[in-house]
Amino acid sequence: SPQGLREAADRLRRSGVFKSVSLGVDDCITAQDQLGITATLVENKRRHFSFGAEVASTEGVGITGEWMHRNLFGGGENLKIDGAISNIGVAQGGVDYLLGAMLERPATFDADTTLTFGIAGGIIDDVDYDMNFILISTGLRRVFSSTLSGSASVSCLYAQTTDPGGETTFQALALPLTLIWDTRDSTTNATKNGYV
């Protein structure tokens, strides 16, 4: 059905593997009374790198970088590794370092569910405290319909801080849940409906 074709094309686009997706119905019926579908796909570059730098009078120089590998194992998996160095050259405090990685696996359990794994760590050198931390997370993202999507995840944080009061160790467990209802007529230039 046309609706089924649209849903299949949307799933392929959401994977991030393809920059262009077109699904069309064939003109002729086969001997088994079946109508074929032709898929025209243009694959994104498998590897992507980005780099950024910013300068602020109060926060010094910041440098960010990101590397992404699309379709890592051939099933639409995306691996993203990003890092940041900030507060370079500030008068107070020190340099902060952040490094993280995220693996996304689409079509887990069913065609509309994406499984995610993430790990991040950092060193924060603030005026009032120093902190070393590591954060590990895993979760599921689900598209329920063309207007409704949601996610559920679990994350574990371990951090050590040092301040004038001494050294403190933190351990935290978080269970973030999100639900998005998007009825906008356009994601880039909406003129009606809403986003909650």
Please place each PLM-identified region on the residue numbering:
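Gram-negative/organellar outer-membrane beta-barrel architecture
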Residues: 2-196
